[in-house]
Amino acid sequence: MAGAKEIRNKIGSVKSTQKITKAMEMVAASKMRRSQDAMEASRPYAETMRKVIGHVANANLEYRHPYLEEREAKRVGYIIVSTDRGLCGGLNINVFKKAVTDMQTWREKGAEIELAVVGSKATAFFKHGGAKVAAQVSGLGDNPSLEDLIGSVGVMLKKYDEGELDRLYVVFNKFVNTMVQQPTIDQLLPLPKSDSEEMQREHSWDYIYEPEPKPLLDTLLVRYVESQVYQGVVENLACEQAARMIAMKAATDNATNLIDDLELVYNKARQAAITQELSEIVGGAAAV
């Protein structure tokens, strides 16, 4: 019965692991709801900012902010958002693949690539790959704040202001629903013009800037970039919790199936051992 004992020990080990994955699934489900609330609370602000900036980019302003000017893309920057922890399926690798594919397209055009990374997974992945990382931030936790991101965003904005970058993108996982997380690349700079039909129809008016366009736009456009990066971070956080919940549920279900299989093997081994003992008893009695 040595084999049966080993199987019984393995069943106990799998059951212990199953308890852990079930607990992690429940924790992730709870955190996902909170993350979704935070994401949905900030999404209207980010979307409204995008509409306002889209209108500003289409306007004929007396003051043309540098962020509105198109220039030849010789240096391209990416702010890549990832998680600090694993056990969330292919969430990180999917967004990394999306970013790497886009980077390769720019490299083929002769552009240099520079990164700012959010989350320890992106830091490890791109540093291991030899990428040029200008800024990094990790340890944001389950309640990231805009203040945590200003430093890294500021580094990339300064490089853009000084002509060290000609394009700036943010890469993150967009939360579609619990089952779908979509790797997304959004252009931050130069400011993307709105190409929606609604905006084109309504573009017969313009904003009045008080007191002057320059100081207002200098502040507004920086806030716009910060808000889009922050939205990417909270979207990615909701995706992380959803992906972890799904991964842990799959692990729990797999553990259940494995336990069933092991119990079947155990019962067969036990039955074989009993049959062998009975055969030995019958054989011994016949010999007598």
Swiss-Prot record:
It is a peripheral membrane protein. Gene3D superfamilies: 3.40.1380.10, ATP synthase, gamma subunit, helix hairpin domain. GO terms for cellular component: plasma membrane; proton-transporting ATP synthase complex. GO terms for biological process: proton motive force-driven plasma membrane ATP synthesis. The keyword ATP-binding does not apply. Keywords: ATP synthesis, Cell inner membrane, Cell membrane, CF(1), Hydrogen ion transport, Ion transport, Membrane, Transport. The keyword DNA-binding does not apply. It is found in: Cell inner membrane. One of its GO terms (molecular function) is ATP binding. InterPro entries: ATP_synth_F1_ATPase_gsu, ATP_synth_F1_gsu, ATP_synth_F1_gsu_CS. NCBIfam families: ATPsyn_F1gamma, PRK05621.1-1. Produces ATP from ADP in the presence of a proton gradient across the membrane. The gamma chain is believed to be important in regulating ATPase activity and the flow of protons through the CF(0) complex. HAMAP family: ATP_synth_gamma_bact (MF_00815). F-type ATPases have 2 components, CF(1) - the catalytic core - and CF(0) - the membrane proton channel. CF(1) has five subunits: alpha(3), beta(3), gamma(1), delta(1), epsilon(1). CF(0) has three main subunits: a, b and c. Belongs to the ATPase gamma chain family. This is ATP synthase gamma chain. It comes from Vibrio alginolyticus.
